[in-house]
Amino acid sequence: TLNLIPGMSKIQIRDLPEGVLFGNLESLFSQMLHNMGRMLPRAAAVLMNSFEELDPTIVSDLNSKFNNILCIGPFNLVSPPPPVPDTYGCMAWLDKQKPASVAYISFGSVATPPPHELVALAEALEASKVPFLWSLKDHSKVHLPNGFLDRTKSHGIVLSWAPQVEILEHAALGVFVTHCGWNSILESIVGGVPMICRPFFGDQRLNGRMVEDVWEIGLLMDGGVLTKNGAIDGLNQILLQGKGKKMRENIKRLKELAKGATEPKGSSSKSFTELANLVRSRGSYEN
């Protein structure tokens, strides 16, 4: 584990993105990280889509190394996205479900699990009878088990796009099956919804480790792979067992901290004011 880095003691070496300590160290991604590492100490300020209360030890350590670490998020609270049409009737369907009972599944706009994992997840959803909303690209639906859509239409919806922010903030949501992209994690925190994590690349493994072992607001799939039994177990733990209740308590605490950070006297609002003052002062200096 990364014991030498404050706030990272539960992070394992294998959780780091490829191109940092292993993998192709000559890749464009690795070179970008290297160049970023050289530039950050020279920056007048480093902006983060986060809030100080989420990782106070990490933020404090970064502030000791760089000029100004300014947490000015979560962006989805600071500048909420405009409402979108409920094309598929998601919200009306959610209104009919019990509180904290629905699984929402989305792996972002870039990655999709391989076919055998899609099958495993579909089988888990069918066997568990958990109400679900699944945002799945049209070209991936061919990998679902034959007859799955018909057999689950009474308790689930599969759609090609979903209004994620609105869904995660609905009272019926009980768990978010996610790729652990940073925006999705913040949206889940703001919605107060625990997560089942299936990371793919970049910072996603590290994010998933934070979710499970540091913040204790979700579960990582064993080996980072979706299996039928693993998915059923994860759904049961979060939706039906005491462990899930504790996760909901933890994430609701973070939700309140996130909201507080974006209040007029909150940490993120103060950081944004500091950023504005910095920009004005440098503009005056250059003039």
Swiss-Prot record:
Reactions it catalyzes: an anthocyanidin + UDP-alpha-D-glucose + H(+) = an anthocyanidin 3-O-beta-D-glucoside + UDP
SUPFAM superfamilies listed in its UniProt record: UDP-Glycosyltransferase/glycogen phosphorylase
Domain of life, source organism: Eukaryota
EC number in record: 2.4.1.115
Tissue specificity field: Expressed in cotyledons, hypocotyls, roots and leaves.
PROSITE patterns cross-referenced by the UniProt entry: UDPGT
Enzyme class: transferase
Pathway: Pigment biosynthesis; anthocyanin biosynthesis
InterPro entries with a match to the protein in the record: UDP_glucos_trans, UDP_glycos_trans_CS
Any one GO molecular-function label of the UniProt entry: anthocyanidin 3-O-glucosyltransferase activity
Gene Ontology biological process terms, A to Z: anthocyanin-containing compound biosynthetic process
Positions with a binding annotation for UDP-alpha-D-glucose: A162, Q164, H179, W182, N183, S184, E187, D203, Q204
Keywords noted in UniProt: Glycosyltransferase, Transferase
Residues where an anthocyanidin binds: G202
Similarity comment: Belongs to the UDP-glycosyltransferase family.
Functional note: In the presence of other necessary color factors, this glycosylation reaction allows the accumulation of anthocyanin pigments.
Name assigned to this protein: Anthocyanidin 3-O-glucosyltransferase 7
Organism encoding this protein: Manihot esculenta (Cassava)
